Design a protein with these regions (language model features):
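TRAFAC-class small GTPase G-domain
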Residues: 1-156
Length: 156
């Protein structure tokens, strides 16, 4: 399939927020509760929109400090970012501001962003209310979604 448009989307967030679980759920249609990311994984997804063939390369990054330089390199040419936090861990929402600065310093201007509150299946342990995520998304001028790790509601 020859693509008319090729996009790159990087998934960023702190360690243990479920970035890799989202990635695996989206591409392999399975759910794993414990996955350790080491470095970077990437996979393409193909779409057709209004007659245009689109290839989107999704890049899953490890959240550990030692992998920041890898994330930094991918950001230079990325078209969009999915910022992920864990709704059961307030600190991961607070770290989104760090990631926003990281993106602003290392990517092209006006990059597309989505803020994604993960682990809605653990809502009984919720530390971040929907409104908090939505307010931060408004501040970052991006869309906000929440989802369960186990189910694929908003991924497409």
């Amino acid at each position: 399939m020859s693509e008319n448009i090729i996009l790159k989307i990087v998934i960023l967030g702190a360690s243990t927020v479920g970035k890799t679980s989202i990635f695996i759920r989206y591409f392999q249609k399975e759910f794993k509760t414990t996955i350790t990311s080491v470095g970077v994984d990437f996979k393409p997804k193909f779409f057709k929109l209004e007659g245009e063939k689109i290839k989107v390369n999704y890049i899953d990054t490890a959240g550990q400090e030692k992998f920041k330089s890898i994330s930094q390199n991918y950001l230079k040419s990325t078209d969009g970012v999915i910022l992920v936090f864990d709704i059961t861990n307030k600190e991961t929402l607070d770290l989104i501001n760090y990631w926003e600065d990281f993106i602003n310093k290392n990517s092209k201007p006006n990059i597309g962003k989505i803020l994604f509150g993960n682990k809605l299946d653990l809502a009984d342990n919720r530390e971040v209310e929907y409104e908090e995520g939505k307010n931060l998304a408004n501040k970052l001028k991006c869309k906000y979604y929440e989802d369960r790790r186990k189910y694929r509601i908003y991924y497409e």
